[in-house]
From Swiss-Prot:
Family annotation (Gene3D superfamilies): 3.90.950.10
Record bears the keyword Repeat: no
HAMAP family associated with the record: Non_canon_purine_NTPase_YjjX
Role noted for this protein: Phosphatase that hydrolyzes non-canonical purine nucleotides such as XTP and ITP to their respective diphosphate derivatives. Probably excludes non-canonical purines from DNA/RNA precursor pool, thus preventing their incorporation into DNA/RNA and avoiding chromosomal lesions.
EC top class named in words: hydrolase
Protein name in the entry: Probable inosine/xanthosine triphosphatase
Residues at which Mg(2+) binds: 36
Subunit field text: Homodimer.
Organism of origin: Saccharolobus solfataricus (strain ATCC 35092 / DSM 1617 / JCM 11322 / P2) (Sulfolobus solfataricus)
Length: 176
């Protein structure tokens, strides 16, 4: 049985990973482990990739799993607008590495202002929307889209994309 270690105990990340594995019909054992990303509490731009990779790599080390998976949400200033997205990073014991990025969405200035004051996106969203711990539920994306797209939905697609070098037997071991 293949084991995959998720570098987080966030219930949204666990649920999204389970859903992606179900869609892929992969009967893998999922281990969720609390891993520090090694980057700032609110990563910006490239830090998001570093944090996701650190989570994946350290999840393997902590659990001796076959695959490590890290999910890190971040923000970045693009053409004067702040966008939010997530990076999903996958590493196997054999050293195969791949990543994928979620859809991006712009953040309103009220949330950006709080982020620039040192708040994390989830914390800033909770302040603006008067919610509690939204990062373990619908997330900023759910609050902004009236839950048409929630945080779990945002993560499922990049998890599937990041894992393709492992589950796609046609390209497995040929491109990576």
């Amino acid at each position: 049985m293949v084991t995959i270690a998720l570098g987080s105990k966030n219930p949204v990340k666990i649920s999204a990973t389970k859903e992606a594995l179900e869609i892929l019909r992969l009967n893998w054992d999922l281990i969720a482990t609390d891993i520090d990303s090694g980057v700032d509490k609110q990563p910006f731009c490239d830090q998001t990739y570093v944090g996701a990779r650190n989570r994946a790599l350290n999840a393997i080390k902590a659990t001796n799993a076959d695959i490590g998976l890290g999910i890190e949400g971040g923000v970045c200033n693009v053409y004067g607008k702040f966008i939010a997205n997530a990076v999903v990073y996958v590493i196997t014991k054999e050293g195969v590495e791949n990543f994928a990025i979620s859809s991006s969405f712009t953040l309103p200035s009220s949330i950006v202002s709080l982020i620039l004051q040192g708040k994390e996106l989830g914390e800033a969203s909770d302040i603006i929307f008067k919610t509690i711990n939204s990062k373990t539920k619908e997330g900023a994306v759910g609050l902004l889209t009236n839950n048409i797209i929630d945080r779990k939905t945002l993560y499922v697609q990049p998890i599937i994309l990041a894992l393709y070098p492992i589950y796609n037997t046609i390209i497995n071991n040929t491109l990576f």
